[in-house]
Amino acid sequence: MQKVVLATGNAGKVRELASLLSDFGLDIVAQTELGVDSAEETGLTFIENAILKARHAAKVTGLPAIADDSGLAVDVLGGAPGIYSARYSGEDATDQKNLQKLLETLKDVPDDQRQARFHCVLVYLRHAEDPTPLVCHGSWPGVITREPAGTGGFGYDPIFFVPSEGKTAAELTREEKSAISHRGQALKLLLDALRNG
């Protein structure tokens, strides 16, 4: 099996990708297991940051790398929190603080102007100098609610209402979410690209 470094320390992401990519002869290992520190995310887009993370992991380990960069873009806020989604409420950000800050920011915004999208970019680099990385982008439209609902998922899921499902992302089962989410879409594109060589 070809060992591939996943540019994350998130055990959940590692497990998810490892099970899906094992069929392609890829052995997914978290960068933290290989002693790789996180890359500095200096890009201004999800694509730039995913490439920075993948290139850093590939350079340090000498292995192919996969990286993910994702976040929430709210239309009325010009795409914010965007690439700053995980640290929207500041240096000591938590999911709860980020969610509360977004609800407070949108408190006077009418219901018909609360559209948002989750974005996920997955990048696969064959090596650190790969000039043609695989870049896969998934986008998931929804609406920001006024109150949290549901206990599943993480991040902004409790306030991200999915009109097609009639519930928030936090109220979806893991299987339901994976089938339609931004990350699920990006992962499907990556699997298709790997399958087709």
UniProtKB/Swiss-Prot annotation:
<keyword id="KW-0547">Nucleotide-binding</keyword>
<keyword id="KW-0546">Nucleotide metabolism</keyword>
<feature type="active site" description="Proton acceptor">
    <location>
        <position position="69"/>
    </location>
</feature>
<dbReference type="GO" id="GO:0009146">
    <property type="term" value="P:purine nucleoside triphosphate catabolic process"/>
</dbReference>
<dbReference type="GO" id="GO:0035870">
    <property type="term" value="F:dITP diphosphatase activity"/>
</dbReference>
<keyword id="KW-0378">Hydrolase</keyword>
<dbReference type="GO" id="GO:0046872">
    <property type="term" value="F:metal ion binding"/>
</dbReference>
<feature type="binding site">
    <location>
        <position position="69"/>
    </location>
    <ligand>
        <name>Mg(2+)</name>
    </ligand>
</feature>
<dbReference type="InterPro" id="IPR020922">
    <property type="entry name" value="dITP/XTP_pyrophosphatase"/>
</dbReference>
<dbReference type="InterPro" id="IPR002637">
    <property type="entry name" value="RdgB/HAM1"/>
</dbReference>
<dbReference type="GO" id="GO:0017111">
    <property type="term" value="F:ribonucleoside triphosphate phosphatase activity"/>
</dbReference>
<dbReference type="InterPro" id="IPR029001">
    <property type="entry name" value="ITPase-like_fam"/>
</dbReference>
<dbReference type="GO" id="GO:0005829">
    <property type="term" value="C:cytosol"/>
</dbReference>
<feature type="binding site">
    <location>
        <position position="177"/>
    </location>
    <ligand>
        <name>substrate</name>
    </ligand>
</feature>
<dbReference type="GO" id="GO:0009117">
    <property type="term" value="P:nucleotide metabolic process"/>
</dbReference>
<dbReference type="Pfam" id="PF01725">
    <property type="entry name" value="Ham1p_like"/>
</dbReference>
<dbReference type="GO" id="GO:0036222">
    <property type="term" value="F:XTP diphosphatase activity"/>
</dbReference>
<feature type="binding site">
    <location>
        <position position="70"/>
    </location>
    <ligand>
        <name>substrate</name>
    </ligand>
</feature>
<comment type="function">
    <text>Pyrophosphatase that catalyzes the hydrolysis of nucleoside triphosphates to their monophosphate derivatives, with a high preference for the non-canonical purine nucleotides XTP (xanthosine triphosphate), dITP (deoxyinosine triphosphate) and ITP. Seems to function as a house-cleaning enzyme that removes non-canonical purine nucleotides from the nucleotide pool, thus preventing their incorporation into DNA/RNA and avoiding chromosomal lesions.</text>
</comment>
<dbReference type="GO" id="GO:0036220">
    <property type="term" value="F:ITP diphosphatase activity"/>
</dbReference>
<feature type="binding site">
    <location>
        <begin position="154"/>
        <end position="157"/>
    </location>
    <ligand>
        <name>substrate</name>
    </ligand>
</feature>
<keyword id="KW-0460">Magnesium</keyword>
<keyword id="KW-0479">Metal-binding</keyword>
<feature type="binding site">
    <location>
        <begin position="182"/>
        <end position="183"/>
    </location>
    <ligand>
        <name>substrate</name>
    </ligand>
</feature>
<feature type="binding site">
    <location>
        <begin position="8"/>
        <end position="13"/>
    </location>
    <ligand>
        <name>substrate</name>
    </ligand>
</feature>
<feature type="binding site">
    <location>
        <position position="40"/>
    </location>
    <ligand>
        <name>Mg(2+)</name>
    </ligand>
</feature>
<protein>
    <recommendedName>
        <fullName>dITP/XTP pyrophosphatase</fullName>
        <ecNumber>3.6.1.66</ecNumber>
    </recommendedName>
</protein>
<comment type="subunit">
    <text>Homodimer.</text>
</comment>
<comment type="similarity">
    <text>Belongs to the HAM1 NTPase family.</text>
</comment>
<dbReference type="GO" id="GO:0000166">
    <property type="term" value="F:nucleotide binding"/>
</dbReference>
